[in-house]
Amino acid sequence: MDHLNVTFKRGTGHFTALEIDRLQIGSGECFGLIGGSGSGKSTLLRVLAGLHRNWQGQVQLLGQPLVAQRAFKGALRQQVQMVFQDPYASLHPLHRIRRSLREPRQVNGLPFDDASLIASLEHVGLPAETLDRYPHQLSGGQRQRVAIVRALQLNPGLLLLDEPTSALDMTVQAEILNLLQALRRETGMTMILVSHDMNTVAHLCDRALLISQGRVQQRLDRDALSHLAGGA
């Protein structure tokens, strides 16, 4: 991306929520966005997910240029998926897990069956009977695993992760991060991780941006991430 500028309305005017001069993320890389609340990190993720369209600049995603003010079309709708901090953002509380997992494939006209859904669940350490449960019958860590499985149903090339472990206790956080690390090795997909926690980003990412008040404060490579996390 080049000269990305994201604005929001404020009263009768606008304010700039995010400015990035240039950013390039390689295929198969895990890239981190670090910052506090209101820093602009989640704003960037929403632009890349097609959820926020009021921006200016040049953005190319998986080889395809994005157009401001336009919804994703074609392959991008399948190739870009997102995992939220709150799994209920993608899991309907009144739907069994079976329905939530088959929905992405059903909407896109792709085949699905219980056997493939069970295999997906077992791959992330969840038993087959999870299909018949409701979200509230699962622990927070189990719900997040289901949300990850749902995001992977369309075999995306880019997985956007918005604070996926911040609501979990430390042990479960480590389990989810290790799961994401293993999935990345297996699939080769690109991941972009948003987090306020330096250690979380250092655990998973190759490089990162440190963002504050909508501006890039620091560009961090693997060594810098490890050093800052060690001193955190």
Where are these regions (language model features)?
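Helix-to-loop junction immediately C-terminal to a conserved catalytic motif
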Residues: A49
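A short, surface-exposed alpha-helical micro-motif characterized by mixed small hydrophobic
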Residues: V201-H203
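Conserved ABC ATPase "signature" region
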Residues: D114-E129
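ABC ATPase NBD coupling module
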Residues: P65-Q81, H95, R99, V107, ...
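The feature captures the beta-strand-to-loop junction immediately N-terminal to the Walker
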Residues: I34-G36
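Conserved ABC ATPase signature
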Residues: Y134-L138, Q142
